[in-house]
C-alpha cells in the first residue's frame, strides 16, 4: 500500500498452489513470467516506472511454502512481456495463413464419390442447414449408407464458408472412429488442407505409465515451457495423424495427451469420444467453456442418453472407502486428515436410515444435511493427499478410482434434485449413488448456442421419441434417410423361441438347433448375438460346432485377432458374441466377410434397480416407462447387430431373429422401415 500511495512502485503477488514435497528453491519460470506480465500491465495502466513482483507458493491450507520477490523497471517488464507474446503472434499468423489455404481447398472440395447414394445428398443438405441455422438435427441413417461422408462433407463446406470455427466428430467407442478417418482420407485425396486431430484416452497415450505429476514424470515437468515450439512445428505439418503427433511429442519430451489438448485449440477437425465435449468432469474446458463456434457431429447417437446418465451420476462406495482407509492408515497413520475424512463419510453412510424390510437395495427420498458436507470435506482431503509424497504407491490407483466417483457425486448433489434418484446397494457397507434421470435437459443445455449439432445413428428410431430423450426442440429437424440397398438383399427370418429368463435353459437346445441348421444349409461366416455372457455360455455348451466365443475382457489386439477369421479370404467362421458389445456395433465386414447374423432375444436390458428407477421415471414423465427404459434400448441393439450384414450395394446376407416377441406389433413398430421379416 505505501508503494501504491506513492504511485512510484507497486507490489504484484502471484499466488500459486504448491504441490511438491519440498519447498521450491526458485520460482517456476512460467509462474514468474505470469507475475511479470501482471507487473507490465500495472506499469502501463498506472504509469509506473517500476514494480515489485512476487511469486508466492502456498499449500491448499494457506501455508506459505516459498516467496520470491523481484523488482523490475517498466522497460524490463515490457521487454519480457513482448518476448512472451512473440510465439503467440507467430502462431496467429500461421493459423491465418493455414485458414486461407484451408478455405480455398474447401471451396474446391467435391463429394468423395462419383454419385450420391439415395438420401445422401438430402442428408448433407440437412447437416449444412443445421450448421447455418445453429440448430440440432436428429437423423436416422441405415448402416452402410456412408454416414461419415454425408455428415463430414457438408460440415467441412460450412467450415470453409466461415459458418463454424471447428468440427468435432464424437464417437461412443474407439472402433467407431474408423469411418470418420476413412472419409477424411478420401477427402484428402483432393489436396485438402486440413488439420484433423484424433484424441485417444489419456492412459492409452501415456508412454511412461507413471504418476501424472512433475515430480514423477519428466514429460509433465516443464511441459508448457516446451509445447509452444512443438505447436509451431505441428503447424508446418499437414498430416496430424496420431503417429505424427506422438513423434513431435517425443521430440520435445511432452505429454502426448496434454499436447493433443493444446492442438485442439487450433485444429479444424477433432475426432474424439463423447466425454471430451459433454462430460462435465473431463470435457475440454478451453474449447467448450469459452467459444461456442463449434459444430458437433455425434455418431451412434442412440448411446447418448445412457452415456449422459453415466457422466452425470456419482457414488460413494462405503466398502471401497474402508479398503482404501486401511491402506491410508498403514501409510500415514490414523491421525492423517484423509483417514479422518474417510471415517466421517463411512460413519455418515452407516448412520443412514435404510428400510427394515430385509431388502439389499432401494431408493432413499433424501439424504441428511451433513452427508453432503462430509463428502465435500473428503474430496478436499483427497486433493490435499494427492499433493503429498509419503508412500502412496499402494494407494495411488485406488485413490483415483475412489476420488472420481466421489467428485461426480458432489457435482450431482449441486444440481437440481428433481433430476436425480438416490439409490443404495448393499446393507452391510452400502454404496450410495446419485443417479441421473434426465439426460435431455443436460444435453440441451450443453449444446445450446453451438454452431450446429447433428445426432445420427442407424438406430435413432423412432425419431420423435429419440428427439424427446435428447431434449430436442420442436424446431430441431428430424430426418430419416432411406436404405439405399434393395430390401431383398437382406433375408430376415423370425423363429418363435421363448428366450425369457425363466425359459433360457430349455431354449438353449432350440437355439443351438437353429444355428446348426442355418450354417449347415448355407455354410459361410456368421455372428451370433446373445443378451448376456451367461446365456452365451449356456448355449455354447450345447452347440456341437467349432466356434469362437467373445470374452468379457478383450484388448484391441484380441479383438483384431477375433475378427481375423472374417477378414481372411475364404473359409467359414462362427462366433458367439454379446448383443450391444464391441462386435455388434462399429465393425465393418463387407462382401463375403460376413454372410449373416443370428440375434437371440429382443435385447432388453437386465432388470435391476437402475432400470426400474428409470422405468418409473419415464412412466411419470413420458407415459410409457417400459418403452423408454427397456424396449427402445433393446431394439436399438438388435438393429445395430443386423446392420453388420449389408454394408455395400452388392452385399447379400441373412438375419435370423430368435424370439416370439418379434411378431408383436409393439416390437414391429420399432423395426427399421426397410426390414422385410418372414416366418
Label every PLM stretch briefly.
Residues 151, 178, 252-269, 273-377, ...:
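Signature of the SF2 helicase/ATPase Hel1-core->accessory helical subdomain module
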Residues 531-553:
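Conserved helicase motor "Helicase C" RecA-like lobe of SF1/SF2 P-loop NTPases
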Residues 1-7, 11:
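Single conserved hydrophobic/aromatic residue that forms the stacking wall/gate
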Residues 245-265, 270, 281-287, 381-499, ...:
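A contiguous, basic/glycine-rich beta-loop/short-helix subdomain that forms a polymer-engagement track
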Residues 496-506, 552-663:
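Conserved RecA-like P-loop NTPase helicase motor core
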Residues 103-106, 110, 163-270, 278, ...:
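A substrate-engagement module of RecA-like helicase motors
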Residues 132-154:
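Walker A/P-loop
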Residues 97-140:
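Conserved pre-motif I regulatory segment
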Amino acid at each position: 500500500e505505501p508503494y501504491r500511495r506513492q504511485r512510484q512502485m507497486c507490489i504484484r503477488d502471484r499466488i500459486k498452489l504448491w504441490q511438491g514435497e519440498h519447498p521450491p528453491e526458485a520460482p517456476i519460470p512460467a509462474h514468474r513470467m505470469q507475475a511479470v506480465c501482471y507487473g507490465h500491465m500495472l506499469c502501463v495502466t498506472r504509469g509506473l516506472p517500476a514494480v515489485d513482483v512476487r511469486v508466492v507458493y502456498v499449500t491448499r491450507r494457506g501455508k506459505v511454502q516459498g516467496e520470491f520477490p523481484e523488482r523490475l523497471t517498466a522497460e524490463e517488464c515490457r521487454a519480457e512481456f513482448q518476448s512472451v507474446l512473440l510465439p503467440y503472434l507467430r502462431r496467429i499468423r500461421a493459423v491465418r495463413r493455414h485458414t486461407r489455404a484451408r478455405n480455398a481447398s474447401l471451396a474446391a472440395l467435391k463429394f468423395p464419390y462419383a454419385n450420391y447414394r439415395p438420401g445422401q445428398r438430402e442428408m448433407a443438405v440437412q447437416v449444412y442447414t443445421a450448421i447455418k441455422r445453429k440448430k440440432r438435427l436428429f437423423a436416422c441413417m441405415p448402416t452402410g449408407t456412408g454416414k461419415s461422408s454425408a455428415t463430414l462433407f457438408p460440415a467441412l463446406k460450412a467450415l470453409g464458408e466461415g459458418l463454424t470455427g471447428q468440427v468435432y466428430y464424437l464417437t461412443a467407442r474407439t472402433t467407431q472412429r474408423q469411418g470418420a478417418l476413412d472419409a477424411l482420407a478420401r477427402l484428402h485425396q483432393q489436396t485438402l488442407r486440413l488439420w484433423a486431430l484424433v484424441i485417444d484416452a489419456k492412459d492409452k497415450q501415456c508412454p511412461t505409465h507413471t504418476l501424472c505429476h512433475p515430480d514423477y514424470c519428466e514429460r509433465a515437468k516443464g511441459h508448457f515451457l516446451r509445447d509452444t515450439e512443438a505447436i509451431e512445428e505441428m503447424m508446418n505439418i499437414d498430416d496430424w495423424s496420431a503417429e505424427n503427433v506422438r513423434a513431435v511429442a517425443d521430440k520435445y519430451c511432452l505429454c502426448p495427451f496434454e499436447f493433443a489438448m493444446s492442438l485442439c485449440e487450433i485444429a479444424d477437425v477433432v475426432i474424439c469420444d463423447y466425454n471430451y465435449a459433454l462430460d462435465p468432469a473431463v470435457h475440454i474446458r478451453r474449447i467448450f467453456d469459452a467459444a461456442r463456434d463449434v459444430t458437433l457431429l455425434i455418431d451412434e447417437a442412440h448411446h447418448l442418453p445412457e452415456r449422459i446418465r453415466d457422466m452425470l451420476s456419482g457414488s460413494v462406495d462405503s466398502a471401497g472407502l474402508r479398503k482404501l482407509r486401511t491402506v491410508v492408515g498403514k501409510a500415514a497413520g490414523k491421525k492423517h486428515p484423509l483417514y479422518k475424512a474417510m471415517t466421517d463419510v463411512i460413519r455418515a453412510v452407516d448412520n443412514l436410515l435404510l428400510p427394515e424390510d430385509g431388502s439389499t437395495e432401494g431408493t432413499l427420498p433424501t439424504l441428511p444435511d451433513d452427508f453432503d458436507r462430509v463428502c465435500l470435506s473428503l474430496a478436499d482431503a483427497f486433493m490435499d493427499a494427492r499433493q503429498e509424497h509419503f508412500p502412496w504407491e499402494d494407494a495411488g490407483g485406488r485413490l483415483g478410482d475412489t476420488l472420481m466417483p466421489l467428485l461426480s457425486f458432489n457435482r450431482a448433489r449441486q444440481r437440481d434434485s428433481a433430476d436425480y434418484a438416490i439409490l443404495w446397494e448393499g446393507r452391510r457397507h452400502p454404496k450410495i449413488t446419485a443417479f441421473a434421470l434426465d439426460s435431455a435437459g443436460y444435453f440441451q443445455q450443453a449444446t445450446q448456442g453451438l454452431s450446429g449439432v447433428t445426432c445420427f445413428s442407424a438406430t435413432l428410431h423412432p425419431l420423435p421419441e429419440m428427439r424427446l430423450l435428447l431434449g430436442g426442440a420442436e424446431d430441431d429437424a428430424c430426418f430419416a434417410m432411406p436404405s439405399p440397398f434393395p430390401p431383398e438383399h437382406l433375408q430376415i427370418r423370425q423363429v418363435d423361441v421363448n428366450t425369457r429368463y425363466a425359459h433360457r435353459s430349455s431354449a438353449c437346445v432350440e437355439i443351438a438347433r437353429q444355428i446348426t441348421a442355418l450354417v449347415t444349409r448355407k455354410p459361410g461366416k456368421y455372428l451370433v448375438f446373445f443378451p448376456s455372457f451367461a446365456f452365451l455360455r449356456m448355449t455354447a455348451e450345447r452347440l456341437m460346432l467349432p466356434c469362437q466365443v467373445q470374452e468379457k475382457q478383450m484388448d484391441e489386439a484380441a479383438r483384431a485377432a477375433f475378427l481375423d477369421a472374417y477378414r481372411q479370404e475364404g473359409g467359414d467362421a462362427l462366433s458367439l458374441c454379446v448383443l450391444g458389445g464391441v462386435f455388434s456395433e462399429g465393425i465393418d465386414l463387407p462382401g463375403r466377410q460376413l454372410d449373416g447374423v443370428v440375434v437371440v432375444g429382443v435385447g432388453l436390458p437386465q432388470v435391476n434397480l437402475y432400470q426400474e428407477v428409470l422405468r418409473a421415471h419415464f412412466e411419470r414423465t413420458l407415459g410409457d416407462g417400459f418403452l423408454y427404459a427397456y424396449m427402445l434400448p433393446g431394439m436399438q441393439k438388435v438393429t445395430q447387430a443386423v446392420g453388420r450384414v449389408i454394408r455395400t450395394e452388392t452385399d447379400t446376407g441373412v438375419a435370423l431373429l430368435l424370439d416370439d416377441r418379434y411378431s408383436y406389433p409393439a416390437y414391429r413398430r420399432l423395426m427399421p422401415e426397410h426390414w422385410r421379416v418372414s416366418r
